[in-house]
């Protein structure tokens, strides 16, 4: 990796994390701590970050990550209905990926205790699945994003290169026919792209409120999706537009269950 590229990545990491220690950056980039200190000194002079005792802090206010506790209470009925439908596509012996969405967490909660291998970047999903003795759980590791209680970044992306799975179950912040799937967080988008690449099938779990939204970071085309599971709030014209593009759509009816 070129010096300029490493320094750009350092800025991205610091902005994502708000703060980080020199030792962590040294591990991420496999260079000495002295090299990282020189990088931070240069970046501070360029007004791209601020050095602190033992590390660096962001000079930006970044709000692309919504706190998990807030997402957990948003569109709960829709997300639970979608999660229940998605769980039907999992069978014993599968190797699957779950992203760090609240819908994937709801899915983790209801997955039967059968022979499965689950790779996830979600702390919540990993903890939930750890209670099921027949399910093997692999965490991607990486940089912890405190608001979403998930891992992302270069280490998380590299960890996926080791694996191949049958199915990936993920969500997004926005999707439409022309622009595909998108996310407000660049690192989450990059990791989801890697998840799709490592999987035979990708099942998108997205409630109807996300239809038509176009967020900052592109994930992938809807042509990369094997099936979209959404809720019955998605209007028939939109369903037809998706099906015209050869996207298989399952729109689950909504009940009063919470």
Swiss-Prot record:
Originating organism: Bacillus subtilis (strain 168)
Protein's GO biological process: regulation of DNA-templated transcription
PROSITE patterns registered for this protein in UniProt: HTH_DEOR_1, HTH_DEOR_2
Protein name stated in the entry: Uncharacterized HTH-type transcriptional regulator YulB
Biological classification of the source: Bacteria, Bacillati, Bacillota, Bacilli, Bacillales
InterPro entries: Carb_Metab_HTH_regulators (IPR050313), DeoR-like_C (IPR014036), DeoR_HTH (IPR001034), NagB/RpiA_transferase-like (IPR037171), Tscrpt_reg_HTH_DeoR_CS (IPR018356), WH-like_DNA-bd_sf (IPR036388), WH_DNA-bd_sf (IPR036390)
GO molecular function ontology, one term from the record: ligand-modulated transcription factor activity
Keywords: DNA-binding, Repressor, Transcription, Transcription regulation
UniProt cross-references to PANTHER family, sorted A to Z: AGA OPERON TRANSCRIPTIONAL REPRESSOR-RELATED, HTH-TYPE TRANSCRIPTIONAL REGULATOR SRLR-RELATED
């Amino acid at each position: 990796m070129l010096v300029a590229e490493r320094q750009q990545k350092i800025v991205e990491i610091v902005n994502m994390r708000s703060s980080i220690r020199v030792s962590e950056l040294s591990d991420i980039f496999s260079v000495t701590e002295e090299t990282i200190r020189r990088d931070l000194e240069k970046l501070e002079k360029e007004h791209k970050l601020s050095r602190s005792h033992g590390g660096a802090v962001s000079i930006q206010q970044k709000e692309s990550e919504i706190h998990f506790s807030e997402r957990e209470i948003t569109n709960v009925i829709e997300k639970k209905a979608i999660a229940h439908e998605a769980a039907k596509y999992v069978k014993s012996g599968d190797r699957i990926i779950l992203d760090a969405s609240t819908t994937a967490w709801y899915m983790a909660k209801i997955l039967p205790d059968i022979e499965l291998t689950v790779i996830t970047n979600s702390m919540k999903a990993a903890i939930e699945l750890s209670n099921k003795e027949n399910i093997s759980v692999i965490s991607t590791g990486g940089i912890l994003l405190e608001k979403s209680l998930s891992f992302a970044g270069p280490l998380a992306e590299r960890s996926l290169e080791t694996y191949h799975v049958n199915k990936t179950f993920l969500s997004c912040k926005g999707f439409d026919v022309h622009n595909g799937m998108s996310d407000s967080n660049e690192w989450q988008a990059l990791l989801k792209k890697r998840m799709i690449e490592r999987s035979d099938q990708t099942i998108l779990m997205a409630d109807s409120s996300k239809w038509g939204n176009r967020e900052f970071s592109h994930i992938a085309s809807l042509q990369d999706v094997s099936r979209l599971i959404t809720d019955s709030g998605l209007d028939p014209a939109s369903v037809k537009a998706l099906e015209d593009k050869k996207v298989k759509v399952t729109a689950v009816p909504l009940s009063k269950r919470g």
